[in-house]
């Protein structure tokens, strides 16, 4: 189940119940991945992971290995991008970010959705550049 209530304790409540052996709880909130894993989630269905698969995978694996301080440091560095991605709704933010990263050819969306505002695109681009520097040092 994708748990995106915003309450990591919800994962603990679910996993404390008698569940089928193949039942898995996944975080559905990028910004709360670490606390969800601490509360029994076994992974994440991520938005930001589409733009930063290596960084977000590393964060997730650290949390799953119990290396919470290291995972929290990465989560903190990703706070701004996680916030910005949802300021104009999903998938507006991630589409704009992927376009800025030149990973997709267009940031157009189907109506009634519209592309990200120029203000959000500028903030995403600034944040992206800082996060790219952080990731390059982390994986150097």
Spans of features found by a protein language model:
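Structured C-terminal cap/extension of enzyme domains
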Residues: 31-140
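Ligand/cofactor pocket segment of small-molecule handling proteins
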Residues: 1-37, 42
